[in-house]
Amino acid sequence: MNMALISLAIDYKKSPIEVRSEFALSGLDVSMLYRSILAIDNVVHAVILSTCNRTEVYLEISNLRVVDDILVWWQGYVRNPNYKIKDYFKLRQGTEVIMHLMKLACGLESMVLGEPQILGQVKDSYTLSKKNHAIGKELDRVFQKVFATAKRVRSETRIGYCPVSVAFSAITLAKRQLDNISSKNVLIIGAGQTGELLFRHVTALAPKQIMLANRTIEKAQKITSVFRNASAHYLSELPQLIKKADIIIAAVNVLEYIVTCKYVGDKPRVFIDISIPQALDPKLGELEQNVYYCVDDINAVIEDNKDKRKYESSKAQKIIVKSLEEYLEKEKAIISNSAIKELFQKADGLVDLSLEKSLAKIRNGKDAEEIIKRFAYEIKKKVLHYPVVGMKEASKQGRSDCLVCMKRMFGLNVEK
């Protein structure tokens, strides 16, 4: 069966967050999703990726006309009928799918260029597909090459070390100041958009504990509810929370400092304030044991890293192009070897049947020389039957290129 590789995607480049939310497949029963998409005729294998910035479905299909059926399937999960998937989705095919997936896993397609979290999300999607028996050999080879490429990009470039967003830069600064973050407690003050983004970046680092403090605890609880080592708190609990914390990051709207020197003892801490107006007293940084960063410090890091990240991005692109070439060459070899194996099996089948008949006749006393001549004639006819039919058909259609190719295959003179 001839397979085609395609992907259908809705992402932040074309769709605002309210649209992405409507078409998101996260939060649904994963097994049910895979059962339903694999039940569509001509869908053979699938991997579903759904994050806050994109939802993408990677597929092996046996007929390109199935795209309309897949769109109908996806539309069925949309709550608001005013949103039509045909207005937002992007279709990729063949090599374009592999190139996109490589760039995606390396962070080159992310809203924050080079951010590392997407690779983990792609790996999780791949694992879920395997768990649901939804991935085939070709798609599996694609993802394995993608992961190897992402690993190479991370090891041979510094694209993940050059943060260009305030939240991501803040987390990067915290990582630089503290070794073994898995043993540290992190306090995030504020559960707004930036605070939530901070929280998600921190969870990817797997610290010992994450505490999220907010004026209204309901919002903090909503953000922390799905994470085992996370807890939600009122702002009034700050004095107790600060005592536990090794890293304190503030992203909250206040009119005066809510953390001052009176809250801290001799324990070394990293304070990062991305609030405007400032929420953490700058005098915290004057204490010898503390490290203090404000928005201006972070913006300086961002500006300094923009050019670096562009340079690292170009290096990553070259690695991806080379990796794609390697993958395609290997696939050609796999296809070629498969075709050669099938050709020999076909020949064996033709020879074995005729040979058995010929040997039986010889054993029954028939003229061996005559039988061997007949055997050779029959094999010649059988082996050349399909090539001759193909050459005649190519000639009828004016496909001189096919004729030349077949002549070369059989060692004939291509000039005639």
Curated annotation (Swiss-Prot):
Q: Name one GO molecular function term.
A: NADP binding
Catalytic activity, EC:
1.2.1.70
The entry marks the following residues as binding NADP(+), namely: G190, A191, G192, Q193, T194, G195
Give the reactions, separated by semicolons, that this protein catalyses: (S)-4-amino-5-oxopentanoate + tRNA(Glu) + NADP(+) = L-glutamyl-tRNA(Glu) + NADPH + H(+)
* Stored InterPro entries: 4pyrrol_synth_GluRdtase (IPR000343), 4pyrrol_synth_GluRdtase_dimer (IPR015896), 4pyrrol_synth_GluRdtase_N (IPR015895), GluRdtase_CS (IPR018214), GluRdtase_dimer_dom_sf (IPR036453), GluRdtase_N_sf (IPR036343), NAD(P)-bd_dom_sf (IPR036291), Shikm_DH/Glu-tRNA_Rdtase (IPR006151)
Q: Name one GO biological process term.
A: protoporphyrinogen IX biosynthetic process from glutamate
One short Pfam family name for this protein? Shikimate_DH
- What UniProt keywords apply to this chain's record, in alphabetical order? NADP, Oxidoreductase, Porphyrin biosynthesis
- Description of how the protein assembles with itself and partners: Homodimer.
**Family as reported in the entry's similarity comment:** Belongs to the glutamyl-tRNA reductase family.
Q: What else is known?
A: During catalysis, the active site Cys acts as a nucleophile attacking the alpha-carbonyl group of tRNA-bound glutamate with the formation of a thioester intermediate between enzyme and glutamate, and the concomitant release of tRNA(Glu). The thioester intermediate is finally reduced by direct hydride transfer from NADPH, to form the product GSA.
Q: PANTHER family given for it?
A: GLUTAMYL-TRNA REDUCTASE
Entry's HAMAP family? Glu_tRNA_reductase
Domain text: Possesses an unusual extended V-shaped dimeric structure with each monomer consisting of three distinct domains arranged along a curved 'spinal' alpha-helix. The N-terminal catalytic domain specifically recognizes the glutamate moiety of the substrate. The second domain is the NADPH-binding domain, and the third C-terminal domain is responsible for dimerization.
Role played: Catalyzes the NADPH-dependent reduction of glutamyl-tRNA(Glu) to glutamate 1-semialdehyde (GSA).
Q: Which NCBIfam families does the record match to this protein?
A: hemA (TIGR01035), PRK13940.1 (NF010548)
Name assigned to this protein:
Glutamyl-tRNA reductase
